[in-house]
Amino acid sequence: WGGNVTFDDFCEYILPYRIGDEPLSLWRKDLYDTYNPLLDKFRKSADSNDIIKAAQILMDTLRQGKYRYTSLFPKGPHIGPVALKWKTGSCREFADAMIYVMRALGVPCGMDRVIQRGDTNASHFWNFILDKDRNTYMAEFPYQENWKKASEYDITKGKVYRVTYSLNEELTKELKDVPSVHPIFRYPFFHDVTATYLGQQNGQIVIPQKELYDCPRTGELVYLCFANKQEWVPVACTFFDGKAVCFDNVEGGIVAILATYNEKGLQTLSNPFTLNHDTGEIHYLNPLQESHIISVYKKFYFAVKNYFNTRMIGGVIEGSNQKDFQNVDTLLLIKEAPYRLYTVAYLNPDRAYRYIRYRGGKGSYCNIAELSFYENSLDTLPMKGKIIGTPGCYGDDGRREYTNVFDGNPDTSFDYKFPDTGWAGLDLGKSYRVSKAIYTPRNDVSFIYKDNIYELFYWDKGCWNSLGRQTAVADSLVYTVPQNALLYLKNHTTGNDAVSYTHLRAHETKA
């Protein structure tokens, strides 16, 4: 496959002796000697010029290890080739590990990233490789089984950049006369590859001057910013042409704001706005004088595609009088993703059952956090029984077994090791008519919790404005808020100003 790699790609995605700022080490020969034998048979096959197949062989082997995700690694230099040995870290460390192996074996591989996701409070990194026609294939190692085309990657990305060893000379030249450039763009070792991932979903943002409450000078650099908690993070930049601010190659499904940058930091120019993923329509979040009453169930709305709560769609609650559930009755089919901490379902069974369970839908990994059953619809104490289910969880570390479903803790969950056939239930000892079930989806501890203290804010002309604090008496809050406002909910009980569970989103609440 080496004959299909261009010289430029070789110099950028194979030759570099380091990914970024990691400590120097002599890693290439050791990794070549370790992983090269895996490709001996492949080199003799008819497909030996297929880069994707070579990369798949290597990834299949790398995925056999047990990896542990953690976001606790401090921000700073890359850790280097030890990422392969430790098998612990965030998406950045996992992407680094893949790059070292691929480059050692002559596969053009690198890292694509989003500086800030447009629908959740995180940046993200993943791997890419280039086929013989320079088409991009991507993988979220170690979770993704196969390399897939960039256009098939379906998370909300907003803007995508390819990390490079060389400086982006074109962008550097454009910014050389700007007196104060935001640190993210000051030394741009990256290129914009958003169009590679979006295809026909590639959008454009045009914000006319009339939507700016603080108009920049003609030719002044303006940043497109996405939200991270109470901060705004630049993800793209352009120059104001005197009439409008225009950004090409932006994916919809995001909340953004415009800002300039100087020695005092970011200075916002507009109120927030959304870009519709399907239509490309821009909606401005300018708070109105009119207010309305809303109920808040979660600290951010479920904009993230394939979020945990959606995995409950298609799940069923079943009853049986046989331990193996050979003869089973469906008591409830979950048709919608739950949006609150506790969802109550009334079952109205025709008969009594000794065994009752939740069985996850196809591809759900039986993701569920908590489940309780009640003999009568007015009961408040759940039924007791022997916990039964399918053993085994992702990572085989025992942290997300089926027993979590009945531990009374909505912050723990079941994550079955296979996408299908997982279930968790109770042996009640004898047959009962079960009239009610209450369930909680797997989650990131962002629901509303009783007795926690919350504060709701809305954004208007450059700052967050408080709508007051409340102590939750159930799994929801009620607020009167300005219509058409961007809202932000902060938990003062479990969070702190630095790493609080706070999320900024538009229309995240249910009226």
Please provide the spans of the model-predicted regions:
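Linear, non-domain "peripheral" regions
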Residues: 1-48, 271-273, 360-362, 500-505
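Hydrophobic/aromatic-rich core segments of domains that either
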Residues: 40-61, 72-81, 86-87, 92-184
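A short, amphipathic beta-strand motif
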Residues: 203-213, 502
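Short, ordered, surface-exposed loop/turn motifs in non-cytosolic proteins
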Residues: 212-230, 310-315
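Short, acidic Ser/Thr/Gly-rich low-complexity loop/linker segments typical of extracellular
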Residues: 229-243
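Short Pro-Gly-centered beta-turn/loop motif in secreted/extracellular proteins
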Residues: 244-256, 261-263
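Structured interaction patches on ligand/partner-binding surfaces of diverse proteins
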Residues: 262-289, 504
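Disordered, acidic Ser/Thr/Pro-rich linker "stalks" and the adjacent N-terminal cap
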Residues: 288-343, 348-352, 363-434, 440-449, ...
